[in-house]
Amino acid sequence: MKFLRNQFLLDIFVAVKHLLYLPYVFGDEQLFQQNSELNPKSYNNVADMLISAKDSLIGFSSKYQKQIEIQDTNVYFLNGICTNKNVWLLNAKHIESIFDFNVQPLHNKTKGVIPDLLECIFGRTFDLLNYETFCLYYTVLESLKLKKKTIVIAHSQGGIIIAQIVKQLIKQNIDLSLLEVYTFASASDEMPLGNYHCEHFANTKDYVARIGVLEYKDNFYGNIFIGEHKGHLLNIHYLNNFKRNSYSNIHNSKLLSYKKPTV
């Protein structure tokens, strides 16, 4: 109990320590550029965007569900907070435009900004797994048990969840040699050591990355690629910068090998 209390106080200290970077969460790029999560033209219609905005505030969105077919290579996208099915699809579409991937859903359903933030605290500070995390865990587990190459791309809170999933897989002595994990702006305070491939991408002026992967670099398994950028949005602040190869030592990234030659 004392350890949990100390860990909670440490997380509060870290959150306050980096508050200076909170205003940079939306970066300084054109927020309404093509593929932006904030651009109405990125959605099928205005209603989809308004529903996404509503869901990010108060939740009640249905989880994005699609029949998942186990293939020889399975690529899953695990989103962060305030992401309903419309935003998930927008992110997945941009991932597919950059990489030779057919992305399948590992949808972390939004319950609204406050409940989502509380989930981050419970998951990261107290290492509590909720029902949804277990569901995501079994999806990854099934792919690995069938000896299929399994790639997980995680953003923000998704970094916390995939760290929890990997810890559970390690506890169950699951062979992780076919697992690859790529996180963007991970909010986690760790990534467990194991027999799998892992990479992390972080912007120096992204508040979430600063209180997560950048603050706890020594606790992270896998290479960390750092970009001198602002912003936390996956599409315009991370994937677009990845397209421009503007992360440190990017030539050492295995994820780079999946990029389409025409991008």
Go through each PLM region and give its residues.
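Intrinsically disordered, low-complexity segments that are common in secreted/host-exposed effector
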Residues: 8, 35, 41-62, 225-229, ...
